[in-house]
């Protein structure tokens, strides 16, 4: 199963784009920091990940999402490649909420 629930802080201004097929894509970058148990010890965890929310009516998020706000994103991980072919994991959010 490919499912991720991630809370974090919005680290860049959200950007809304429309694909050639007319689908809206809201682009976010979320940073998460926490302490996680591993092998009987506490480990500092840090992740910065691109998040994409796709669908209709996403314009309202641009006013709500400000740099530094806390969000919960839930969805699946997908591999993207940049123009040079460098791979990266992107969270394709199916649910997004301010917390």
Question: At which residue positions do the language-model features occur?
Answer:
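Single-stranded nucleic acid-binding surfaces, predominantly the OB-fold ssDNA-binding core
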Residues: 1-99
């Amino acid at each position: 199963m490919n499912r991720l629930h991630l809370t974090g802080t919005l680290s860049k201004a959200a950007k809304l784009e429309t694909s050639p097929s007319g689908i809206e894509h809201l682009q976010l970058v979320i940073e998460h920091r926490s302490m996680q148990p591993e092998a009987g010890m506490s480990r500092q965890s840090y992740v910065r990940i691109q998040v994409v929310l796709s669908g209709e009516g996403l314009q309202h998020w641009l006013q709500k999402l400000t740099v530094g706000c806390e969000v919960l994103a839930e969805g699946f991980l997908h591999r993207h490649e940049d123009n040079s072919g460098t791979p990266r994991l992107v969270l394709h959010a199916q649910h997004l909420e301010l917390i």
